[in-house]
UniProtKB/Swiss-Prot annotation:
The active site is at H41. One of its GO terms (molecular function) is CMP kinase activity. Beta-alanine binds at Q65. It is found in: Cytoplasm. NCBIfam families: cmk (TIGR00017), cyt_tran_rel (TIGR00125), panC (TIGR00018), PRK13477.1 (NF010004). ATP binds at residues 34-41, 160-163, 189, 197-200. SUPFAM superfamilies: Nucleotidylyl transferase (SSF52374), P-loop containing nucleoside triphosphate hydrolases (SSF52540). Pathway: Cofactor biosynthesis; (R)-pantothenate biosynthesis; (R)-pantothenate from (R)-pantoate and beta-alanine: step 1/1. Catalyzes the condensation of pantoate with beta-alanine in an ATP-dependent reaction via a pantoyl-adenylate intermediate. Catalyzes the transfer of a phosphate group from ATP to either CMP or dCMP to form CDP or dCDP and ADP, respectively. This is Bifunctional pantoate ligase/cytidylate kinase. GO terms for biological process: nucleobase-containing small molecule interconversion; pantothenate biosynthetic process; pyrimidine nucleotide metabolic process.
């Protein structure tokens, strides 16, 4: 692991890595932090390491984020401990610049913001919630995050959902400034009590930590009220009152704000069409804590992942039929794109030409119940199952531009919920907030046998079981090791081995699991 405190040193090192044949320029992940690393940061680091060749952790206590009377001087500084933490977790590079390196002449000056060019985000995003009591906070966040993205030039940058307002502002910043980076948000990591993990938790006594867990308990109570009364007039006002009432049972918590907003635009909501953010801030003693939870007013999403030959496609279709959900065959979308590239004569490895094709293609599902796949007006339902497409789809699917446009289309399909989708990174990347995530697997022998039967049923009899096994092993290696969104099991996915189980048995298992989940109980009655 390398530690750099200057931009020159960091840039020199990263440029050397980019120029090495074995290091691709699209595999750098950045985890921006202010130090005092904890389990929440660990989840970001692990995600970055899984999805990138090089992981960079920045440690910078940003003075622009602190108001004159806030705890800049007292904010925990433990670089040596953080270095050990990062090295243990396999981080490749730490970037720990000084304020002067980041362009601030005097970090402790009250006019620090006037000493450097700053980034100003839309006022409607910064003037509510945390922005009311911290008017310069998000300007400071946006400025330093922009600097870090320009310095490191990562492919992916990782942020926690706990700082939901910050996350929305950064996503908008990246979009508005056309910055070439993918913003990845990761779920909130909590103590056993439900308290969201934060660097500021170390200011709390054990008793205060237990008392502070009422923040999350109140949010959960609000969500429960929402799910049970979604069609009631003025339901959001009812939810807010319920949260405040629950919070009042712990009088040491002093509420600063409670808001229900759109998680992307941060605009206050009067009703929830698809999804809303229930966000809270409160003080316990002198320590300010924030937390949030999502309120969904849509049919559920089920994400089913797993390796090739695990039986995902057939099972997913049947689960959709059983629960009245639309089957979104994302694998077929990638196959359709691969077929299009092969038909065009463009080499599948020519990423620029592939990008030209994919950025202009339109995929649709005509007669979803019959799984007809159409690309640019042509039905390719049968053609995309050929061996040629199968042997090339991982190469095409791993390309950043392909994945960007396919994920964008998939998320548009899922905006209103009511779908079940299968693939290799559906739960981890495409629909990270899916109500239920399943990871289907099976032994290599079983997967190969199934694939051989499928090929023979399609008239492809000139292939042996050994050849199929080799193809599946090769496919697994490509899917697991691809640099962009590799095959991986989400930490909150339920794993099901399909060896020795019939298709019907696997389907019923998933349906039963769905019906017993929290969201399933509240949603399934509207579907079945």
């Amino acid at each position: 692991m390398r530690l750099f405190t200057t931009i020159a040193g960091l840039n020199c090192y990263l440029n050397l890595l980019r120029n090495e044949q074995k290091k691709s320029p699209d595999t750098i992940g950045l985890v921006p932090t202010m130090g005092a690393l904890h389990k929440g940061h660990l989840s970001l680091i692990k995600r970055a390491r899984e999805e990138n060749t090089i992981t960079v952790v920045s440690i910078f206590i940003n003075p622009l984020q602190f108001a004159p009377r806030e705890d800049f001087k007292e904010y925990p500084r433990q670089l040596e401990i953080d270095k050990e933490f990062c090295e243990k977790e396999g981080v490749d590079v730490i970037f720990a610049p000084t304020p002067e390196t980041m362009g601030m002449k005097n970090a402790l000056s009250t006019d620090a913001q006037d000493s450097t060019t700053t980034v100003v985000s839309p006022s409607h995003m910064t003037s509510i919630m945390c922005g009311v009591s911290r008017p310069n906070f998000f300007q400071g966040v946006a400025t330093i995050v922009t600097k870090l993205l320009n310095i490191v030039k990562p492919n992916n940058a990782y942020f926690g959902q706990k700082d939901a307002q910050q996350l929305a502002i950064i996503k908008q910043l990246v979009k508005d400034l056309s910055l070439p980076v993918n913003i990845v948000y990761c779920p909130i990591i909590r103590e056993a009590s439900g308290l969201a993990i934060s660097s500021r938790n170390q200011y709390l006594t054990p008793e205060q930590k237990e008392q502070a867990s009422m923040l999350y308990a109140s949010l959960c109570y609000g969500r429960k009220i929402f799910l049970e009364n979604q069609d009631t007039p003025n339901i959001l006002e009812t939810v807010e009152n319920a949260v405040k009432e629950k919070l009042a049972s712990q009088p040491v918590l002093k509420l600063e704000y409670l808001e229900i907003v759109d998680p992307e635009t941060l605009k206050p909501l009067e009703n929830i069409q698809n999804i809303g953010l229930l966000a809270i801030a409160a003080y316990i003693g002198s320590c300010r804590l924030i937390d949030n939870i999502l309120l969904r007013n849509r049919k559920p999403i089920i994400a089913i992942d797993g390796p090739a030959g695990a039986g995902k496609s057939t099972v997913t279709k049947l689960v959709g039929q059983s629960l009245g959900l639309l089957y979104l065959d994302t694998g077929a979308m990638y196959r359709a794109v691969t077929w299009m590239v092969l038909q065009s004569g463009v080499p599948v490895t020519d990423q620029a030409q592939v990008a030209e094709l994919v950025s202009q293609c339109q995929i649709s599902f005509n007669s979803p119940e019959n799984n007809h796949v159409v690309i640019n007006g042509q039905d390719v339902t049968v053609a995309i199952r050929s061996r040629e497409v199968t042997n090339n789809v991982s190469i095409v699917a791993a390309q950043p531009t392909v994945r960007y446009f396919m994920v964008k289309q998939q998320q548009q399909f899922g905006a209103k919920g009511g779908i079940v989708a299968e693939g290799r990174d559906i739960g981890s990347h495409v629909f990270p907030n899916a109500e239920l995530k399943i990871f289907l697997t099976a032994s290599l022998k079983e997967r190969s046998r199934r694939r051989l039967v499928e090929l023979k049923q399609k008239g492809q009899t000139n292939i042996s079981l050994e050849e199929v096994e080799k193809e599946i092993i090769c496919r697994d290696q490509k899917d697991t090791n691809r640099k962009i969104s590799p095959l991986r099991k989400s930490s909150d996915a339920v794993e099901i081995s399909t060896d020795g189980l019939s298709i019907g048995e696997v389907t019923q298992k998933i349906v039963d699991i769905f019906k017993t989940t929290c969201y399933g109980k509240s949603s399934v009655n509207n579907i079945i």
